[in-house]
Amino acid sequence: MKVLAVIPARWASTRFPGKPLKEICGKAMIHWVWDQTIQAKSVTQTVIATDDDRIAEYCRANDLDVVMTADSHPTGSDRLAEVAQKIEADVYLNVQGDEPLIEPATIDAVTDCLVAAMERGIEVATAYIEGATDAQLDDPSVVHLVPALDGSVITFSRLPVPYPMAETMQRSVHVGLYAFSRAALLRFPELERGPVERAESIEVMRYLEHGHRIACVPVEPGSIGVDTPEDLVEVE
């Protein structure tokens, strides 16, 4: 089974332009993500997908495989689908380019989750961390995931769901790492972006809004997503 890890990287970011090439301890952030990803035992091949010449030049200069994509993709997974048209694989991983501390074990866990889920007819998988901190509950940049008893996803939200009306329940934090079957990924850009995806800016909601199931697996905390210059300082 060929597992292709794709790291989407774009220059244009509202809150932090050019962040893929921002240095962390002397090395570009995208390079840190690459180094973590290639350590995953499940990954057969890794590529960086970008629409920016500056990022592509850095990759080529540092022997990181890069694929140029269109600049019109609304999400990283849409960009991934273009890569899938160019490189064939059985499983595609969307490894966020702003997760320099992503654990290889997390990547392997999501891959294994998808492989098992495909036997149940589920073609997309992701991960979550059990137990949100107080700071995460108040942070709209944090996405929360509500898991079902059967290991699938009920919903995602930037609100700290579920609301504890009757009793307290532990909230979970979504880890922005996705695994797709080839068929599911190629289908992704053909699906209309629904109102919840647009409102919450959570790309994987597109599958749920169209009635498709998503498998999920709990993983250990450890990674820090870089959305702002302050996050970069925290990672260092």
Model-derived regions: residue spans:
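Conserved core of the sugar-phosphate nucleotidyltransferase
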Residues: I102-G194
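Conserved alpha/beta core of the MobA/IspD/sugar-nucleotide pyrophosphorylase nucleotidyltransferase superfamily
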Residues: M169-E236
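Hydrophobic/aromatic residues located in beta-strands of well-ordered beta-sheets
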Residues: A5, T46-I48, Y92, V124-A125, ...
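A structural signal for short hydrophobic beta-strand segments in well-ordered beta-sheet cores
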Residues: L21, L145-P147, C216
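N-terminal glycine-rich phosphate-binding loop and ensuing alpha1 helix
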Residues: K2-A49
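Short phosphate-binding loop-to-helix
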Residues: V47, D53-D112
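Short, high-confidence coil segments that cap the C-terminus of an alpha-helix
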Residues: V43, A89, E119-I122, H212
